[in-house]
């Protein structure tokens, strides 16, 4: 269209899994590999038995274990828009992408969802429903200016043990439940950059990551880096 070129791509996907394996954090009986639910009287009794009678330490009991969630299905849609063109003497390039996913377990047995932080949904753990990526760059003579952003929606389901006490007031990650109740709108981060093409070989850039110093976490306990600046010298040969 005139001096502009663009491409739109739309695709859908359906992935089905039989005997799907997920790693679940919790308590396990080392003698048989079964997961222990410390939030029930039977599970608490088994936990005490494993420690006091069988002699296993807490480090041998707690951790990630492979669990069979039976059947699962992940459906979704991906959209992308790429364009390039000129506004006067300024060349503009844009890349925009969006992904929607609906990752669900098809197993309705309560014993599989009881270890989830939200047992009211069959959404698989540690998944995002919405992902957005965008990048726009403008080039004027030897100068270039760019802005990018990334967004992921709130991770609704995680392992229950990260939010609930494992024994009275003992938490693995103290304060995580309150943190997630406040930061429940997803993560949105913006980056910016400015560059100067010195010659055909060298280009110097100033890059600002997390421009607005947003506090984000991709998964429990993994706080992402605050605002930071980088000076980059690139050599093309």
Sequence positions of predicted segments:
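Short acidic-glycine motifs
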Residues: 3, 18-29, 63
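Solvent-exposed loop/turn elements at secondary-structure boundaries
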Residues: 3-5, 51
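Short glycine/proline-enriched coil/turn segments at helix->beta-strand junctions
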Residues: 6, 138-143, 198-200, 235
């Amino acid at each position: 269209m005139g001096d502009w070129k663009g491409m739109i791509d739309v695709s859908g996907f359906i992935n089905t899994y039989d005997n799907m394996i997920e790693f679940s954090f919790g308590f396990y009986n080392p003698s048989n590999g079964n997961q222990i639910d410390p939030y029930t009287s039977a599970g608490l009794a088994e936990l005490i038995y494993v420690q006091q009678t069988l002699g296993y330490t807490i480090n041998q009991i707690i951790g990630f274990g492979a669990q069979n969630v039976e059947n699962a299905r992940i459906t979704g849609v991906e959209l992308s828009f790429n364009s390039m063109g000129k506004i006067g003497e300024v060349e503009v390039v844009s890349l925009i992408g969006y992904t929607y996913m609906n990752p669900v377990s098809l197993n309705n047995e309560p014993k599989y969802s009881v270890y989830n932080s939200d047992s009211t949904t069959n959404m698989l753990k540690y998944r995002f429903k919405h992902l957005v990526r965008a990048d726009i760059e403008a080039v004027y003579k030897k100068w270039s200016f760019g802005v990018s952003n990334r967004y992921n929606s709130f991770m609704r389901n995680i392992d229950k043990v990260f939010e609930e006490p494992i024994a009275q007031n003992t938490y693995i990650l103290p304060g995580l439940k309150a943190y997630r109740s406040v930061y429940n709108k997803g993560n949105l981060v913006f980056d910016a950059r400015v560059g100067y093409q010195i010659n055909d070989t060298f280009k110097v850039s100033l890059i600002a990551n997390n421009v607005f110093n947003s506090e984000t976490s991709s998964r429990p306990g993994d706080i992402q880096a605050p605002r930071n600046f980088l000076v980059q010298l690139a050599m093309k040969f």
